[in-house]
UniProtKB/Swiss-Prot annotation:
Family as reported in the entry's similarity comment: Belongs to the class-II aminoacyl-tRNA synthetase family.
Name of the protein described by the UniProt record: Histidine--tRNA ligase
InterPro entries: aa-tRNA-synth_II, aa-tRNA-synth_II/BPL/LPL, Anticodon-bd, Anticodon-bd_dom_sf, His-tRNA-ligase, HisRS-like_core, HisRS/HisZ, HisRS_anticodon
Catalytic activity: tRNA(His) + L-histidine + ATP = L-histidyl-tRNA(His) + AMP + diphosphate + H(+)
Natural source organism: Parabacteroides distasonis (strain ATCC 8503 / DSM 20701 / CIP 104284 / JCM 5825 / NCTC 11152)
GO CC field: cytoplasm
Length: 451
């Protein structure tokens, strides 16, 4: 008989892992609600016409396509089958696919429900996505995304609030972070003033690797992309700019004085930093001119969050974008959004052991089962305990005490309630602390007060 297994690139989550994941998602939800965000969900499957062409040719290959039910070969000729062209086959045999991310379904949602939505629309979404990628360490075919966006508003106050949300979430987790920020317009201005505006993608892809590969290798990559030495020399002092955020802003105003686009980006960052100075954020906030994520997507501010006490990639990222819904025929809907990296946050909290003790325990109290007479006596007591909000179990069978205690140990249940004939006669409960072994005779009211 074949041993049961799961597809490569997917995961099972144990009760303990789910308790940790729920702590992460519930914390994020609470903060989103504080800022007026509303939750939506979209179907796991979308029409392929919604998904195809939105992620580039490589992205289209990574879409999980769903075969049409019934005769999926209907309308496909023998010649087309013999051709063995997967994309052409999928175009006829598949009308639906699993969502690749939460952004395109969100854009579809906004267009489809535009008459019901109040703009600006603050939305968050926590759902799994699927990618037909090659599984490897840290890369999965099924994983959760946790996105927040404000659409239908150009106000930079939205960027300020997103920084506050990131700061509050990581403060609640107890993770020390640095929130890095840049602006797509500044990157365009830099490429413009060094005379290489048409090579902005090559420039930004290279400088984004500065932390990982060092300046010499960045320069070598720029040379390989055809940048002249003069342009590379002019770029050096800009990307290596030091000082406080305000000192960097002052320098950029001078350096980018000949670029209208660049100066607009500087003004936007200056506004965000000035407004943030009137809040009480605890995270480090750093203007990083090498930050260049999502270049083909973001049009204004760019954000990235790094954990300070763990060597790991970014744990949150986002930015300002224009025309989110243009691909669906609704022009001019701009917004700003970001995504929490749930799996990386999970890893950071594990490495730093930052999960609050109460967040991981399911059952707080186990009642030992001695038999039918005791069960009848215990059921109203257990109902009273649960009504007080104490997570409680009654062991389902009257088996050996050792087995019941072993169950409590295995589930890390901190307290066990023992009610035998003597306790029933006195209308008391023998409460055992499983950590210390201490036992105390208490009334039901005294038991409830202890939790």
């Amino acid at each position: 008989m074949q041993k049961p297994s799961i597809p490569k690139g997917t995961r099972d989550f144990s009760p303990e892992e789910m308790a940790k994941r729920n702590y992460i998602f519930n914390t994020i939800r609470e903060v989103f609600h504080l800022y007026g965000f509303q939750q939506i969900e979209t179907p796991a499957m979308e029409n392929l016409s919604t998904l195809m062409g939105k992620y580039g040719e490589e992205g289209d290959k990574l879409l999980f396509k769903i075969l049409n039910s019934g005769d999926c070969f209907a309308g496909i000729s023998d010649e087309e089958l013999m051709e063995k062209n997967p994309l052409r086959f999928a175009a006829k045999a598949c009308e639906k696919g699993l969502r690749y991310d939460l952004t395109v379904p969100f854009a579809r949602y906004v267009v489809q429900h535009r008459n019901e939505i109040s703009f600006p629309f603050k939305r968050y979404q926590i759902q799994p996505v699927w990618r037909a990628d090659r599984p490897q360490k840290g890369r999965y075919r099924e994983f959760y995304q946790c996105d927040g966006d404000v659409v239908g508003s150009d106000s930079l106050i939205n960027e300020v609030e997103l920084i506050q949300i990131m700061d509050e979430v990581f403060h609640r987790f107890g993770i020390r972070v640095c929130i890095k920020m840049n602006n797509r317009k500044i990157l365009s201005g830099i490429a413009e003033i060094i005379g290489e505006a048409d090579k902005i993608v090559d420039i930004t892809v290279a400088i984004d690797k500065l932390d990982k590969i060092g300046l010499d290798n960045v320069n070598e990559e720029l040379r390989s992309k055809g940048l002249p030495e003069e342009a590379i020399e002019r770029l050096q002092p800009i990307i290596m700019l030091q000082g406080s955020n305000q000192e960097k802003i002052a320098t950029l105003k001078k350096v980018l004085s000949a670029s209208e686009t660049g100066l607009k980006g500087v003004a936007e960052l200056d506004f965000i930093l000035e407004r943030i100075s009137h809040t009480s954020i605890r995270a480090e906030l750093e203007l990083d001119l090498t930050l260049a994520r999502g270049l083909n997507y973001y049009t204004g501010a760019i954000f990235e969050v790094k954990a300070l006490d763990v060597q790991i990639g970014s744990i949150t990222g986002g930015g300002r974008y224009d025309n989110l819904t243009g691909v669906f025929g609704m022009e001019g809907v701009s917004g700003v959004g970001f995504s929490f990296g749930a799996d990386r946050i999970f890893d950071v909290l594990n490495q730093l052991d930052l999960y609050p003790e109460g967040s991981l325990k399911t059952t707080q109290l186990l009642f030992v089962n001695f038999g039918q007479k005791e069960e009848i006596h215990l059921l109203p007591l257990i109902a009273k305990v649960r009504k007080a909000g104490i997570r409680t179990e009654l062991y389902p069978e009257s088996t050996k005490m050792k087995k019941q205690m072993g169950y409590a140990d295995a589930k890390k249940i901190p307290f066990v309630a023992i009610v035998g004939e003597n306790e029933m006669a006195e209308n008391k409960i023998n409460l055992k602390n499983m950590l210390t072994g201490e036992q105390t005779l208490v009334t039901i009211e005294e038991l409830i007060e202890r939790f």
